[in-house]
Design a protein with these regions (language model features):
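Active-site glycine/GP-rich loop and adjacent strand/helix microenvironment
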Residues: 1-58, 66-73, 80-81, 88, ...
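Short coil/turn segments at secondary-structure boundaries
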Residues: 55-59, 144-147
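Conserved pre-ATP/AMP-binding loop-to-beta segment of ANL
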Residues: 86-102
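Conserved adenylation A10 loop of the ANL superfamily
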Residues: 101-115
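Conserved structural elements of the adenylate-forming
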Residues: 117-138
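Conserved AMP-binding loop of ANL adenylate-forming enzymes
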Residues: 135-179
């Protein structure tokens, strides 16, 4: 019997995955202590910023102190500070200047500029990597590392505003794909830079059709368009086009409305990993194949607060730390981050 030789990547994937699994377990087993440490580091790092001075961070010693001094804000309420950062002012929401702005739409005053700092950027990349490595640690599957991986994302071409690069979060993250994945990554840089989405999807279809695709990742609506174009061109199910496609990674929206459609498009079972990325931070990922739900990332430069959803608009609604939440209750999530968002309501 002829045994298939394993690649170096495949051989190294399992021990690396086990190492990351241990690291994640260390902080996830101690959620309260982990969040307390993050809270203290955030407050300590921002005491000399304009926001920190305005809210007397130097006298904040406990979470109760923070609740008294820092009200919950959405983007519109925080915009007076963000505008100063956008104009190039330093030490406003976080020390120094951000290295990027993630530009998103959807506010009454136009585009939102979400700061990304040198402290927060690594967590956007690390979280996605760790989600895949925990999958390896749990399942033992590593074959996919030998194939091609596609990450459907926005253009990596960035604009500049007062010396700070800005673009879509997915386009910013494209600049941080690890070197060991560069040869496996698709589409090509040139195709990824195509601005027109219709033309981009068509180019991606042409590039990927002859390849050994093993991981496909993206926002479900984008991936659906890609799958439908592949099917239109070949008349085949995705699982038949890409025989070794066995891992689908998705996030950004609720997947349930897409599930039946995707099962039909793919035509066979594939493993999947759900992610919860946002411009404001990478909040969670699915860490177990046999369980629904995601692991909240408590050690990623983000301090979480929660308000019961049905009480959120009440005058006396109570803000809760991770120690006070209950399973099965719907909450509005409030975040403070090492990118300079403070008691920020992301709207989820």
């Amino acid at each position: 019997m002829k045994l298939k030789a394993k690649s170096l990547k495949e051989l190294l994937a399992k021990p690396f995955a086990k190492q990351i699994q241990k690291r994640v377990k260390k902080w996830s087993d101690r959620p309260f202590e982990t969040q307390k440490k993050v809270f203290q580091e955030l407050i300590g790092s921002a005491t000399t910023t304009a926001f920190g001075k305005d809210h007397d961070f130097v006298s904040i010693n406990t979470y109760k102190d923070f609740v008294k001094r820092v009200p919950i804000r959405d983007y519109e309420a925080l915009k007076v500070y963000v505008d100063r950062v956008v104009k190039g002012e330093e030490n406003v929401l976080w020390k120094g200047k951000p290295i990027y702005f993630a530009k998103t739409s959807g506010t009454t005053s136009g585009a939102k500029y979400i700061p990304i700092t040198k402290e927060s950027m690594p967590y956007h990349v690390e979280a996605a990597r760790n989600a895949i490595l925990l999958y390896v640690a749990e399942t033992g599957k590593t074959d996919f590392v030998n194939g091609k991986m596609i990450f459907l994302q926005g253009s990596p071409i960035l604009e500049e505003k007062n010396g700070i690069n800005l673009g879509r979060l997915s386009g910013i993250v494209a600049h941080y794909i690890p070197k060991y994945l560069q040869k496996n990554r698709m589409p090509s840089w040139e195709t990824n830079c195509i601005e027109d989405w219709e033309a981009k999807v068509n180019a991606i279809v042409e590039e990927t059709l002859p390849e050994n695709m093993t991981i496909i990742s993206g926002i479900p609506s984008w991936v659906q368009m890609y799958f439908e174009r592949l099917q239109e061109k070949t008349g085949k199910k995705i699982g038949d086009i890409f025989k070794n496609f066995n891992l689908f990674i998705f996030g950004g929206v609720n997947y349930e409305p897409y599930r039946t459609k995707f099962e039909n498009l793919i035509g066979r079972k594939v493993d999947s990993i759900e992610l919860y990325p946002a411009s404001e931070g990478f909040f969670a990922f699915q860490d177990k194949q046999d369980e629904k739900g995601m692991l909240l990332l408590l050690n990623s430069g983000i301090f979480y607060e929660f308000v019961k959803a049905h009480e959120f608009y009440d005058e006396n609604s109570k803000r809760l730390s991770i120690e006070e939440v209950e399973i099965g209750v719907n909450y509005v999530m409030i975040i403070s981050t090492n990118a300079g968002l403070w008691a920020y309501n992301i709207g989820d």
